[in-house]
Amino acid sequence: MHALMRARPFAALISAGSAGLYASHLPTVLKDDGPYGVIECHLARANPHWSDLAEGNEALMIFQGPEGYITPNWYPSKALHGKVVPTWNFAVVHAYGRPEVMRENDWLLRHVTELTAQQERNGAKPWAPTDAPDTYIEVMLRGIVGFRFAITRLKGKWKMSQNREVQDRVGVVKGLSARAAGDDLEMAEIVSRRITQSN
């Protein structure tokens, strides 16, 4: 589950508090602290969601992995008996916890430095906060509120055609590889890997 969370670090944060139901989408950094890990993230100070999170209620973060439509036309079993229907393949992780508000400048600077390094790691010349004037970074930090989200439970769901016969899964791999749109190639790799593991 951590592998998906690291590969797809842009998560949906959902909470319900005295102001009602909120949802925000934000980049994350996953740490290996504690039994399930800790997620560090931030919101714009102008986003009212952060004050709701400060109440300390349980919240949910959703990490969406590869997903896509699967046509039954890819199943060889369609020609044999016709008992096939379309479906949707997907991978998702739900992380639950109680966010802790982090407002200290040192914490925020460390967080945005780590987040930037995580996202810039494959660049020829990675950008870092130290590339900008200190006074500018200080102003930018005043515009965000950080959160430390200690995960209390994790739930993952992977539906990658594992319920189909091997020949149908091979058909899915071929179909996804030929369509090659969105997450298709990543899904084809996952389905193919699971065929190999099950043999």
Regions found by a protein language model. Give the residues of each.
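Binding-site signature for planar aromatic cofactors or substrates
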Residues: 1-199
